[in-house]
């Protein structure tokens, strides 16, 4: 079935409280998607962010981001008084999230709400703690110790805490019991709102596509609580880390720095870590986009401590074996494979064997440096998801500002672009008209925004990354009607 959707991070929704949340603006966006003839709302990972504000580098691959908790909803539930958050300065720029300011001001408000919630929702909290015990107790303990240790990475904690000495952890649990309760309660508040939002989306015929990074952050509860699943030495320091090799776009490659999986141990344990992770994510989302899918076929391993990715080497991943086990235990999986980047025949075979749809990015189709491009629409298989660009790319208008004249001419000719229609509409039209079963556009492109609205520039640390926000009133009925007509025209409703 031909469908379409919009990529819009929750943090990018309009809000008077500094960042997009799961409140009324999110429900308004769901209604907009429904009116616009869309079937999917794709979001970025909803995990807590850490240094650099990237949702792909999180303290936990299970937890929800406290910043996304809607304060008005907490107030309506009787957990906050309006004057406890309305008069706080959440930042002066409605088009940008200020993470530093949020870090300093949001938690004080959440502490007040959590205190009331502990009394008001005792039964529900007990149930939530029981249901999520597998990850929640480690995460809450991790965050409580982290605060006690002034926020430093767990790799710098005292050895007895790093190596999870049972006696030492028992002492911490007793000493930090109120803090642990707070971090657990914040997750309860997050997932209470999340379930409500997802149910609302589903009732309106909208499915949510979640995004899960293949790797987890080294400074995370995941690695601290499960060190045997990763390539760590006896001192729990990474042996090798993840990244991408040098190519025509980057002489040094990309050094991501995430610890690599110990696939040997994972296989011996029947991939339970992965089965648990995917099972959990499929409860939260309707579909999953798995980032860096090629890493399951072969992964790039860079010696820990290197400053660039030049000295890395390819090593064999688990391949189809992992997906066979997951499928056997969980059934058919609604997964989109992010298969961008350096692809080999064996990656293509793995994708084919799983049956997952891969991704096509239109912005990659017209690059004269890449003559092997499979990104031109006349080469697409039906079983794929086409994007004009993703969160890691320029917006369409930003892209036209950065590409060579030759590439721009090729793109204009191929897609029959005109200034009268607007290059962004012409490019999106090309994607919607393609044979790809699913077409997802960034909200920034639907709004015709330029390079200032780019979500992320990979391998850079900047307050421009992850901070774009949408102004109130921009997703309206007029825009929804235009999109609805396009969907009808190209058979996507």
Where in this protein do the model-derived segments appear?
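C-terminal accessory segments of extracellular proteins
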Residues: 478-493
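Outer-envelope exported proteins of Gram-negative bacteria
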Residues: 44, 207-209, 213, 287, ...
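Surface-exposed amphipathic alpha-helices with a cationic face
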Residues: 34, 194-204, 327, 351-352
């Amino acid at each position: 079935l031909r469908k379409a959707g919009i990529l819009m991070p929750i943090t990018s929704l309009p809000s008077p409280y500094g960042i997009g949340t799961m409140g009324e603006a999110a429900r308004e966006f769901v209604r907009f998607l429904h009116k616009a003839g869309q079937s999917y709302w794709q979001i970025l990972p909803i995990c807590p962010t850490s240094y650099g504000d990237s949702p792909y580098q999180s303290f936990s691959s299970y937890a929800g981001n406290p910043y996304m908790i809607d304060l008005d909803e907490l107030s309506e539930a009787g957990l906050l008084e309006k004057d406890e958050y309305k008069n706080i300065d959440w930042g002066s720029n409605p088009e940008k999230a200020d993470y530093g300011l949020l870090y300093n001001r949001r938690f004080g408000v959440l502490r007040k709400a959590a205190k009331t919630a502990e009394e008001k929702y005792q039964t529900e909290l007990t149930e939530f703690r029981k249901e999520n015990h597998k990850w929640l107790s480690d995460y809450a303990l991790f965050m409580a110790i982290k605060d006690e240790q002034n926020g430093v990475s767990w790799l710098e904690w005292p050895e007895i805490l790093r190596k999870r000495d049972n006696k030492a952890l028992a002492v911490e649990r007793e000493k930090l019991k109120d803090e642990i309760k707070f971090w657990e309660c914040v997750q309860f508040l997050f997932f209470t709102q999340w379930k409500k939002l997802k149910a609302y989306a589903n009732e309106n015929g909208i499915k949510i596509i979640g995004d899960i990074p293949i790797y987890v952050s080294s400074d995370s509860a995941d690695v601290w609580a499960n060190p045997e699943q990763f390539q760590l030495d006896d001192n729990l320091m990474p042996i090798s880390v993840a990244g991408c090799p040098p190519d025509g776009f980057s002489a040094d490659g990309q050094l991501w720095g995430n610890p690599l999986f110990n696939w040997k141990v994972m296989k011996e344990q029947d991939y339970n870590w992965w089965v648990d992770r995917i099972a959990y994510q499929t409860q939260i989302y309707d579909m999953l986009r798995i980032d860096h899918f090629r890493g399951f076929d072969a992964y790039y391993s860079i010696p820990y401590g290197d400053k660039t990715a030049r000295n890395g080497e390819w090593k064999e991943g688990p391949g189809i074996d992992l997906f066979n086990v997951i499928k056997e235990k969980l059934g058919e999986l609604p997964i989109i494979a992010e298969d961008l980047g350096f692809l080999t025949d064996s990656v293509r075979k793995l994708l084919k064997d799983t049956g997952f749809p891969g991704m096509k990015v239109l912005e990659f189709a017209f690059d004269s440096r890449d003559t092997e491009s499979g990104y031109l629409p006349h080469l697409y298989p039906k079983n794929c998801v086409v994007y004009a660009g993703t969160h890691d790319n320029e917006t369409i208008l930003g892209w036209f500002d950065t590409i060579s004249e030759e590439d721009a001419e090729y793109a204009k000719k191929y897609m029959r672009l005109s200034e009268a229609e607007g290059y962004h509409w012409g490019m999106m039209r090309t994607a919607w008209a393609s044979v790809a079963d699913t077409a997802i556009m960034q909200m920034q492109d639907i709004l015709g925004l330029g390079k200032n609205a780019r979500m992320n520039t990979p391998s850079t640390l900047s307050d421009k990354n992850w901070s774009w926000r949408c102004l109130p009133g921009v997703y309206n009925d007029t825009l929804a009607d235009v999109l609805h007509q396009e969907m009808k025209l190209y058979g996507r409703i």
